[in-house]
Amino acid sequence: DEGHSEPSPVWREIVRQSDAIKVVITATPYRNDLFELNVDLDDYFIFTFKQAISDKIITEPNFIQVNSMEKMLQEVQLFLEKNENIKCIIKCKDAYDISRYHESISKKFKTVSIHETFRNDEASGKFKSVNSALKSDNIRVLIHQHKLDEGVDLPEAKLLVLTYQVGSGRELVQTIGRVVRNYNSIEPMIIDLASSSNERMWQSYRVFDDYISTPSGSKGFIKSLSTTNLIKGFLDNFPEYSYFSSRFRERLDLQSINANDISIPLASVCFIEKGPNYSTPLLLDKIYWELHTQGSLVKEIKNDH
């Protein structure tokens, strides 16, 4: 799934054992991607929101702050009447709010609402399935909670209504991403009913995007995705000698560890017998990647013991 993690243990082993070059493509590199496939910190490319605007692929959205459903309905009506064949997406926090907004706006525009608790009912305009909902003709408004956040292609959607404060920056970026693609030169608009909290979070994202648009910012961001790299950086900058836990101590140098200095309690060794398909390199590889995926700093030491 976009390089976040391998979908099955079998697939994971195949990927690990392959010497082929691996290219990971993801729109959300915020979930330990570097742990999963051991991405090279020197070989990467970031296509930012800022660059996509410059390349005229997407357009920066405009925000409008409103404080009532009545005012929101007025803005939606103005936008949709001005722009024929354009659709509006309304994001609600639960099924109750979806039904409430559906009742109000369906009086003016052809509306479909989608939620896991609904049944596919063409007559009422409420659906459980996105595909079933999109089969309806002449839709102008789509109301949902999470169903349209990703995996849905609606280039004609240029108006987004956020009825509540979205919980995370990643979810907000995905949601706004539904309406920013260039389409018929229409500027996307966001109607925010959450006292500008969504707009402020969006501006924080744009500051972040500007930061990773620079060479130093992008390199720092890529490095920060790996806890292993952060731990190593901390150790590298730690004093060579220091005093803590009532002892004078020398900094641990992982590059010069002597395997003979490592003592493993025999009670912790539970290796009893080998199966017919046992492989020591594969066992070590599994242990290495399990620890690496958890964010541990792991070093493989090859010796003759």
Which sequence ranges carry the predicted segments?
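Accessory helical-bundle/CTD segments and flexible terminal tails appended to RecA-like ATPase motors
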Residues: 259-305
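Conserved interdomain linker/interface between the two RecA-like ATPase lobes of SF2 helicase motors
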Residues: 41-100
